[in-house]
Protein backbone atom coordinates (compact mmCIF):
# COMPACT_ATOMS: atom_id res chain seq x y z
CA UNK A 1 0.00 0.00 0.00
CA UNK A 2 1.04 3.60 -0.53
CA UNK A 3 0.51 6.63 1.65
CA UNK A 4 1.31 10.28 1.06
CA UNK A 5 3.12 11.93 3.95
CA UNK A 6 4.58 15.42 4.28
CA UNK A 7 7.91 16.00 5.97
CA UNK A 8 8.04 19.45 7.58
CA UNK A 9 11.51 20.96 7.40
CA UNK A 10 13.22 24.29 7.84
CA UNK A 11 15.52 25.24 4.96
CA UNK A 12 16.83 28.13 2.89
CA UNK A 13 15.26 26.86 -0.36
CA UNK A 14 13.39 23.94 -1.95
CA UNK A 15 16.53 22.09 -2.94
CA UNK A 16 17.94 22.24 0.58
CA UNK A 17 14.59 21.03 1.97
CA UNK A 18 14.61 18.17 -0.55
CA UNK A 19 18.19 17.22 0.31
CA UNK A 20 17.48 17.22 4.07
CA UNK A 21 14.61 14.80 3.58
CA UNK A 22 16.52 12.53 1.17
CA UNK A 23 19.40 12.26 3.66
CA UNK A 24 17.14 11.73 6.69
CA UNK A 25 15.23 8.92 4.97
CA UNK A 26 18.35 7.14 3.69
CA UNK A 27 19.16 3.81 5.32
CA UNK A 28 22.22 4.14 7.52
CA UNK A 29 25.20 1.79 7.34
CA UNK A 30 23.94 -0.05 10.43
CA UNK A 31 20.64 -0.76 8.66
CA UNK A 32 18.60 1.77 10.67
CA UNK A 33 15.71 3.27 8.72
CA UNK A 34 14.12 6.45 10.05
CA UNK A 35 10.68 5.54 8.66
CA UNK A 36 10.84 1.97 9.94
CA UNK A 37 7.17 1.35 9.15
CA UNK A 38 7.89 1.71 5.40
CA UNK A 39 9.92 -0.55 3.15
CA UNK A 40 10.59 2.06 0.43
CA UNK A 41 9.68 5.60 -0.53
CA UNK A 42 9.90 8.29 -3.21
CA UNK A 43 10.78 11.81 -2.05
CA UNK A 44 8.76 14.45 -3.89
CA UNK A 45 5.41 12.71 -3.81
CA UNK A 46 5.98 9.72 -6.08
CA UNK A 47 2.71 8.45 -7.49
CA UNK A 48 0.95 11.41 -5.82
CA UNK A 49 3.08 14.00 -7.67
CA UNK A 50 1.94 16.24 -10.51
CA UNK A 51 4.48 14.59 -12.85
CA UNK A 52 3.12 11.12 -12.07
CA UNK A 53 -0.39 12.26 -12.99
CA UNK A 54 0.97 12.84 -16.51
CA UNK A 55 3.29 9.82 -16.68
CA UNK A 56 3.09 7.09 -14.04
CA UNK A 57 6.77 6.17 -14.50
CA UNK A 58 7.73 9.63 -13.25
CA UNK A 59 6.22 8.55 -9.92
CA UNK A 60 9.26 6.42 -9.13
CA UNK A 61 11.90 9.14 -9.19
CA UNK A 62 12.87 11.47 -6.34
CA UNK A 63 11.98 14.99 -7.49
CA UNK A 64 11.72 18.34 -5.64
CA UNK A 65 9.07 19.85 -7.96
CA UNK A 66 6.04 19.45 -5.67
CA UNK A 67 7.64 20.73 -2.47
CA UNK A 68 5.50 23.38 -0.80
CA UNK A 69 7.22 26.47 0.55
CA UNK A 70 5.28 28.67 2.96
CA UNK A 71 6.84 31.83 1.51
CA UNK A 72 5.78 30.81 -2.02
CA UNK A 73 2.14 29.84 -1.37
CA UNK A 74 0.85 30.47 2.15
CA UNK A 75 -2.72 29.43 1.31
CA UNK A 76 -1.79 26.08 -0.22
CA UNK A 77 0.62 25.41 2.65
CA UNK A 78 -2.08 26.11 5.26
CA UNK A 79 -4.67 24.09 3.28
CA UNK A 80 -2.26 21.15 3.25
CA UNK A 81 -1.88 21.33 7.04
CA UNK A 82 -5.68 21.36 7.37
CA UNK A 83 -5.93 18.33 5.06
CA UNK A 84 -3.32 16.48 7.13
CA UNK A 85 -5.42 17.16 10.23
CA UNK A 86 -8.42 15.62 8.46
CA UNK A 87 -6.36 12.53 7.55
CA UNK A 88 -5.34 12.16 11.20
CA UNK A 89 -8.97 12.44 12.33
CA UNK A 90 -10.04 9.81 9.79
CA UNK A 91 -7.31 7.44 10.97
CA UNK A 92 -8.27 7.86 14.62
CA UNK A 93 -11.97 7.45 13.83
CA UNK A 94 -11.15 4.17 12.01
CA UNK A 95 -9.25 3.00 15.10
CA UNK A 96 -12.20 3.90 17.33
CA UNK A 97 -14.50 1.76 15.17
CA UNK A 98 -12.02 -1.13 14.82
CA UNK A 99 -10.78 -1.26 18.40
CA UNK A 100 -12.64 -3.70 20.62
CA UNK A 101 -11.59 -2.98 24.23
CA UNK A 102 -13.26 -6.07 25.70
CA UNK A 103 -11.54 -8.29 23.12
CA UNK A 104 -8.21 -6.60 23.79
CA UNK A 105 -8.48 -7.10 27.56
CA UNK A 106 -9.54 -10.71 27.03
CA UNK A 107 -6.48 -11.25 24.80
CA UNK A 108 -4.26 -9.75 27.51
CA UNK A 109 -5.77 -12.02 30.18
CA UNK A 110 -5.26 -15.06 27.93
CA UNK A 111 -1.68 -14.03 27.26
CA UNK A 112 -0.95 -13.62 30.97
CA UNK A 113 -2.63 -16.88 31.96
CA UNK A 114 -0.76 -18.82 29.26
CA UNK A 115 2.58 -17.22 30.06
CA UNK A 116 2.84 -15.92 26.51
CA UNK A 117 1.18 -16.57 23.20
CA UNK A 118 0.59 -20.26 22.53
CA UNK A 119 -0.49 -19.82 18.93
CA UNK A 120 -0.68 -17.12 16.30
CA UNK A 121 -4.09 -15.56 15.80
CA UNK A 122 -4.62 -12.87 13.20
CA UNK A 123 -7.65 -11.66 15.13
CA UNK A 124 -5.54 -11.09 18.26
CA UNK A 125 -2.81 -9.40 16.24
CA UNK A 126 -5.20 -6.98 14.51
CA UNK A 127 -6.73 -5.93 17.82
CA UNK A 128 -3.27 -5.26 19.24
CA UNK A 129 -2.11 -3.56 16.03
CA UNK A 130 -5.07 -1.15 16.07
CA UNK A 131 -4.34 -0.28 19.70
CA UNK A 132 -0.60 0.15 19.02
CA UNK A 133 -1.10 2.42 16.00
CA UNK A 134 -3.65 4.61 17.80
CA UNK A 135 -1.43 4.88 20.89
CA UNK A 136 1.60 5.72 18.73
CA UNK A 137 -0.32 8.53 17.02
CA UNK A 138 -1.62 9.86 20.35
CA UNK A 139 1.98 10.07 21.60
CA UNK A 140 3.17 11.93 18.48
CA UNK A 141 4.87 8.88 17.00
CA UNK A 142 5.11 8.35 13.26
CA UNK A 143 2.85 5.79 11.58
CA UNK A 144 1.57 5.17 8.08
CA UNK A 145 -1.50 7.25 9.02
CA UNK A 146 0.29 10.28 10.50
CA UNK A 147 0.27 12.35 7.31
CA UNK A 148 3.10 14.55 8.57
CA UNK A 149 6.45 14.29 10.29
CA UNK A 150 8.18 17.41 11.62
CA UNK A 151 11.86 16.74 11.00
CA UNK A 152 12.90 19.76 13.06
CA UNK A 153 11.12 18.61 16.23
CA UNK A 154 11.08 14.83 15.60
CA UNK A 155 7.34 14.46 16.10
CA UNK A 156 4.46 13.44 13.83
CA UNK A 157 2.34 16.45 14.76
CA UNK A 158 1.86 19.90 13.22
CA UNK A 159 2.05 21.73 16.57
CA UNK A 160 5.58 23.05 16.20
CA UNK A 161 5.48 23.91 12.51
CA UNK A 162 2.37 25.99 13.24
CA UNK A 163 4.34 27.81 15.95
CA UNK A 164 7.17 28.45 13.48
CA UNK A 165 4.65 29.88 10.99
CA UNK A 166 3.67 32.49 13.59
CA UNK A 167 7.23 33.87 13.57
CA UNK A 168 7.85 35.74 10.29
CA UNK A 169 11.62 35.15 10.33
CA UNK A 170 11.03 31.39 10.64
CA UNK A 171 7.88 31.16 8.51
CA UNK A 172 9.72 31.96 5.28
CA UNK A 173 12.00 28.93 5.86
CA UNK A 174 9.23 26.34 6.26
CA UNK A 175 8.72 23.60 3.68
CA UNK A 176 6.47 20.58 3.34
CA UNK A 177 8.19 17.85 1.34
CA UNK A 178 5.74 15.25 -0.02
CA UNK A 179 6.89 11.64 0.20
CA UNK A 180 5.17 8.57 -1.23
CA UNK A 181 5.74 5.77 1.29
CA UNK A 182 5.10 2.12 0.55
CA UNK A 183 4.26 -0.16 3.47
Language model feature labels by segment:
Residues 23, 28-146:
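Low-complexity, serine/threonine/proline-enriched polar segments
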Residues 6-11, 97-98, 148-149:
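Short beta-strand element of the conserved SAM-dependent methyltransferase core
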Residues 9-11, 71, 128, 152:
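Conserved aromatic
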Residues 18, 80, 85-89, 102, ...:
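Well-ordered, non-membrane alpha-helical segments in soluble/globular domains
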Residues 1, 132-133, 137-183:
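Acidic, proline/glycine-rich low-complexity IDRs
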